[in-house]
């Protein structure tokens, strides 16, 4: 299902009709949300998903301004039939990402943990960008989850580098030592660290609102089990 995000999350009559068909219930359903070019990041994705529990996945796409310029099929065909508009395919565009997903050729990046290794993750992202390799989905654990989350949000090396620089400097402050607590499960309470993570991401964003499909892994210390967040 393809929808413009600006139209609101209400379930349409067509969706209700399809939901009543027995054959439709056996088909994998995915949501593609279209966002205007220049949108900083999606918002309110959770509202769309709550109204459609039958969805298997969702994808966010930025659409070029020209897609909203032409309202008739004839004008769209005329634009694409013009040789001047037939340039090389941009493999980094959101529509190329969708095409790879539909063809089972998505490129995923998973970043590991290790504290200071986060700086190395930044260097690897730079190398991937310089090599012209698109990143379609991301995941990670510990510092890798932080770095992959930033990339899924911004998808821009300069912006991610700036956010990382601020966070690295934040974590080097001596005020970190004020976060000491009784060492039952940890030497630090985690409040200072959690606050620094929240500063790096917009307050109103959820995992569902990230541009790229994202997951991260944590450990539930109460049950010693793995938790996957996506």
Where are these regions (language model features)?
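Conserved catalytic-core segment of NTP-binding enzymes
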Residues: 1-61
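A structural signal for isolated positions on well-ordered beta-strands in alpha/beta enzyme cores
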Residues: 30-32, 108, 215-217
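Generic detection of short hydrophobic beta-strand segments and adjacent strand-loop junctions
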Residues: 61-63, 229
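Patatin-like phospholipase
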Residues: 108-110, 117-200, 228-230
